[in-house]
Amino acid sequence: VAEQQEQAAEDAMMTRIGQAVMLHHGGDREEAQGRFLDLWSEIGEEGDPLHRCTLAHYMADTQEDPTDELAWDLRALSAADELTDERLHQHHQSVAVRGFYPSLHLNLAADYAKLERPEAARNHIRRARAAVGTLEDDGYGDGIRAAIGRLELRLGEGLSLIRI
């Protein structure tokens, strides 16, 4: 019974994060950001890696300052590194942690590009490309692959895709 109550509480946190994401996607960036900050204070720096990764990933998107966006994306990556498939499967059975990395590294590459740090951007776009094989051939996977390709071209990495 205690385990079921704990699972319900964890699911409640993911629901609350999802509600803040919906606010942001609906155009209310400031309200979403405020809710994310409140949730982050509940979760804490050492809280559940799934909660930290998910929240930080979406909180980064609400940032206007690229330095702040980078800080949140780095938090998301750090939390993903702590996340296990076992924990993730408690929330969503068909997802593996390795499937997070293409998007996480793509976001970091974009952050570094905005900050005019091309070597760091290239490093992360290469890591995104290396991890992209973990994604399904579906709308999400296709979108991430396309975004990686666009950023590779912007960073001058597009030639790495040509096979002779």
Tell where the protein language model's regions lie, with residue ranges.
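Flexible helix-coil transition and linker loops at the boundaries of alpha-helical arrays
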Residues: 3-6, 42-47, 81-97, 135-138
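Structural signature of alpha-solenoid helical repeat junctions
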Residues: 11, 28-31, 47-51, 68, ...
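Alpha-helical segment of the N-proximal tetratricopeptide repeat
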Residues: 14-34, 41
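TPR repeat positional signature
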Residues: 16, 52-56, 105, 124
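Alpha-helical adaptor scaffolds
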Residues: 54-98
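TPR/TPR-like (Sel1-like) alpha-helical repeat modules
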Residues: 70-82, 114-136
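Conserved small/polar residues in nucleotide/adenosyl-binding loops
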Residues: 162-164
